[in-house]
Each structure stands twice: as C-alpha cells, then as structure tokens.
Amino acid sequence: MILIEEMKIYILNTTRFYHEDFEEYPGAWFSCPVDFEEIRERLGVQSEEEIEIEDYELPFPLEGNTRLWEINALCRMVQEMQGTPLYYEMDVVQKRWFSSFTEFIDHKDQIRYYPVQDGEALARYLVQEVQLFGEVHPDLLNHIDYAAIGRELETSENYLFTDNGIFYYR
C-alpha cells in the first residue's frame, strides 16, 4: 500500500527535446496533490499540454490521458479516507466490487464496515446491534445459530472478509 505521503507522479517537460548531455527528457517527481505553479516553476512549462506523466506511485492506476485535476481530485479523496478501515483495504474492496478506482470512489459512501473478524461474529453483531431481525427478546438471543447465519454471510457476494474487518456493499 502506498502511504499518503508517498503519493507522487513523475512529470516530463515535453517542450524540451532530448539532448545527448541529458540521460532523458527534463522531468521531476511531484508530491500529490500537485500544484501546477510548482510544475511551471520547476519544469519551465506554461500549460498542461506541455507536460506528460511518465511514472507514478499512487494507490490507483492512471490512464494515458488522465488530467492533473483528476489526479488531484482522486488523491484528495484518498486523503479523506486516511485512517479508516476502508483506506487500508481500498485495493481489495475496489477489486471485489468495482471495475475502476473512480467507480470505487463514487460508491465508497455506500460501503458499510463491521469491526468483526468472522461470519459468526458478524451474525451476532447484525442480530444484536443492528437488529437485523428486528428487536429479539433477550431470552431468545442464546438460541440463535449465529454460526449458521455466519456461514451464509460468508458465501454472500455482498460481504468481503478482511484482516481489518468485514465490508458490505450491495
């Protein structure tokens, strides 16, 4: 996992041509979110059309034509999630339910998190805390087969079991 402090992109100045004295085109690493004024100052460019993203270290993939404002928006959304269970499991969650990182970001508020480790604990939590079956009389709580309910939940596509807890999305 890439930490927030480590999110960065390598940007090339495409207006300066390759020269034998240089090993490559002039470029530099920039921390994200990126400030275009810093790019302008360090690379000597005037517009975004004069740059190209050559490399990146981000918790999401970039397409060839991703604009800086899009990268900045995604980085800010990742920063907003920092410290949450979803932040630590975003790669697994995204791959489970979404075809792209942008789609994951668009639906992240619809993902529920349960701070338990297995199906039986999740069943107990859903019955007793969330009141999945409505209010159950306390005398009946000990007669519920939480293990069986948990096994059903574990086979559901709507739940994702991770080391950091369980996520639900429908």
PLM regions and their residue ranges:
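N-terminal ordered "arm"
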Residues: 1-49
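Non-transmembrane, interaction-prone alpha-helical and coil segments associated with secretion
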Residues: 2, 7, 62-70, 74, ...
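Glycine-rich loop/turn
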Residues: 5-23, 113-135
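Acidic, proline/glycine-rich low-complexity IDRs
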Residues: 5-6, 123-170
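Short, flexible beta-strand-to-coil junctions
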Residues: 12-20, 56, 162-165, 170
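Alpha-helix initiation and N-capping motif
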Residues: 36, 119-120, 146
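Structured domain cores in non-transmembrane regions
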Residues: 36-102
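Extracytoplasmic/secretory-pathway segments with low complexity and glycosylation-like composition
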Residues: 88, 92-132, 169-170
